[in-house]
Amino acid sequence: MPRKKPFSVKQKKKQLQDKRERKRGLQDGLRSSSNSRSGSRERREEQTDTSDGESVTHHIRRLNQQPSQGLGPRGYDPNRYRLHFERDSREEVERRKRAAREQVLQPVSAEVLELDIREVYQPGSVLDFPRRPPWSYEMSKEQLMSQEERSFQEYLGKIHGAYSSEKLSYFEHNLETWRQLWRVLEMSDIVLLITDIRHPVVNFPPALYEYVTGELGLALVLVLNKVDLAPPALVVAWKHYFHQHYPQLHVVLFTSFPRDPRTPQDPSSVLKKSRRRGRGWTRALGPEQLLRACEAITVGKVDLSSWREKIARDVAGATWGNGSGEEEEEEDGPAVLVEQQTDSAMEPTGPTRERYKDGVVTIGCVGFPNVGKSSLINGLVGRKVVSVSRTPGHTRYFQTYFLTPSVKLCDCPGLIFPSLLPRQLQVLAGIYPIAQIQEPYTAVGYLASRIPVQALLHLRHPEAEDPSAEHPWCAWDICEAWAEKRGYKTAKAARNDVYRAANSLLRLAVDGRLSLCFHPPGYSEQKGTWESHPETTELVVLQGRVGPAGDEEEEEEEELSSSCEEEGEEDRDADEEGEGDEDTPTSAPGSSLAGRNPYALLGEDEC
């Protein structure tokens, strides 16, 4: 029997590290030499990985990786629909870090906030989305999938050949997720494209509009979601912008949590939050508009009277709940039939699919990640039936929900279309998972040059001895000042954790508590006209009518504390699985950072 070889403590440590890396699904087991939490986060994703097709040599980051030892008991791969983005090179990340430390931030003019869709997507260029290639029933499943993979690689090759990596935005490189979109479009009678009102041009790919209304011959309804986060005049301006440029669109305004815009707002109280309980989902603004749009599209081919009756019941129930002071959400309403689509349901359908089959209209909900597709479905149903999360890519596969016996909703995973947007803007739009950003500082600088972050958060320059003196700010200074104010420290050296502070600032922006809204072209010159527009007044009255009136709890303030340590190095974006709770920005004069109860906010994401 051979002698046992000595096994040192160092070797044992390396063995355990490799084992943990394999469980996380990482390929090369890179470990950071830094002991700080921020350093380990930034270097943990440094492994090289390629997409499923070997013809595209660009490095791909596979986000939302789930630990898995292969297929599950039912043959389900939890990483099948994870986000695939092009990886930033190490040199590019370091260059942006240096710029964040050295570049002095200058406020931009209002005209810079105006976005033209022609500059973002360049209609008619290769910035398209992949189409399902022609197929026939004689083809086997393997032949069809192989053909789709070849077509997808050709699509990626054209884009990367026409534009450099520095010009291209993040966009989806996972073919499995695009297959979800193909299936949803094939089975839908009406397509809802959900966008965020703060930046609707970012979420509106013209190629999808041309494909749905042209090649498929379907009606496209543009939903401007989260209208409570933008001024009513800006909402109306965006609505007219899309009507003017895309006449076949049906535009609907929507929000799951409306507020009265006539309520005075304190822009400095970004850390104030209130909890809405009870019948929050039944207060959604927009179901009536969406019903009218669907009635105009179906022109009597589908009986939608049951949908109208449901809306009337929801409105009456919400009014009764406010009057009686009831706080608990009613759970004994009509059951909602949920269908999870299996692989067999993902098979392509024929080109001559019957429209409004069996008297049922199928409404497909598509859009970018984090625009509120799942929240919109919850608002239409009147209670929570879909899990929602701040983390992009939370919806893994499409599901169908029967709103009424004649109305079926289909929720599609969020997809990011190729464009020429700055990647910092995509991060602020919530498209990229914040906890997995390699370099968040330039996104903070992009935000601070467009809204006065230092003034809103009452930040003190880290090098300022006299608080009244003015000092030039860079993105790194803002992150360091926020880390000092919030008490974010690294684990061992107790230095200011600027990486964690940058993530916290980006979460405030994504949540709408640091609201950055973009404008349609010419809005600055015509702002007064839009503010006095009749539709603006109508929207203000409508939001005030359906806004919260008695279903809000006492406001909560966030604690200035360093006791809220993050658990490990994993994504801390928690799924919002509560049964009717929703954190929403609110305003209150005299907001402070120190809460009276030091344990009240131990579960907050920013801690």
Curated annotation (Swiss-Prot):
Comp. bias regions, Basic and acidic residues: 15-26
Q: Which residues carry this modification: Phosphothreonine?
A: 48, 50
Q: Which InterPro entries match?
A: G_CP_dom, GNL1-like, GTP-bd, P-loop_NTPase
Q: Acidic residues bias located where?
A: 550-584
Name the positions where GTP binds. 225-228, 367-374, 411-415
Entry protein name = Guanine nucleotide-binding protein-like 1
Recorded family membership: Belongs to the TRAFAC class YlqF/YawG GTPase family.
Q: Which domain of life is it from?
A: Eukaryota
